[in-house]
């Protein structure tokens, strides 16, 4: 980064903080680039900041993933207090960065849109303006992999980034940018589209929650999240059984996300977590599948 004494590739040891359960593609990226992935628990209001504060004292820790709103897979929304603590904390590495991936910023399942924290302003106020790389896109709004991406950070970081981005390519697809602008028209236009998204997928989430509660609620053999937005439900089963539940479901013709996939290296030490993704299948398939999962 622009605050680094040398490229990270020349460092002897590199570490990256990963809140868990979290997003497997995030973990795959940092693993591919040679980082040792260290985990912290994801709580209802964001990552366990006390655990983060201890880890970042190590100068080998160069960064951290954060999905601040409707996090994958728990649906957690970070509190302003935790955001400020992440911005304020002392890091052993002067070039420590937080990738603030706001992929689900407007992906509500209700009529309400939570406030989007002004994380760059918070970073400035807390004395670490270069700490955050804020990102988002319309991949889960318009076209998967072919929407419009966003990158926000400090002016110093942007200057450094543009020096490198200018080598990679002349510029983004401005026709696609214009098409998105014309389609949405305004921020309220985005919210209107996302309310329509919610109308399509909310019944599927309700079905999952209803079946889990009906089939498993009284037995205390599982816990699950009740997200207000995002695309996933996080299911925790009895410790040591998640892979077996996944296998039984597979044998019954139900394809779930691999148990442990929400953890770095696919290793859930407690073997308890399964990420449920009900958005794609038709309603009747979601209900049939969840009835089968509850049986497993």
Label every PLM stretch briefly.
Residues 128, 251-252, 265-296:
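PLP-dependent enzyme catalytic core of the Aspartate aminotransferase-like
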Residues 152, 234-236, 277-279:
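Short hydrophobic/aromatic beta-strand micro-patches
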Residues 195-209, 221-236, 250:
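Conserved glycine-rich beta-strand-loop-beta hairpin in the small C-terminal domain of fold type I
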Residues 63, 97, 133:
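Hydrophobic "anchor" residues on beta-strands that sit immediately upstream
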Residues 238-241, 281-283:
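Helix N-cap motif at beta-to-alpha junctions
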Residues 102:
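Walker B catalytic acidic pair
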Residues 121-202:
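Conserved core segment of the aminotransferase class I/II
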Residues 1-94, 105-127, 294:
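Conserved core of the PLP fold type I
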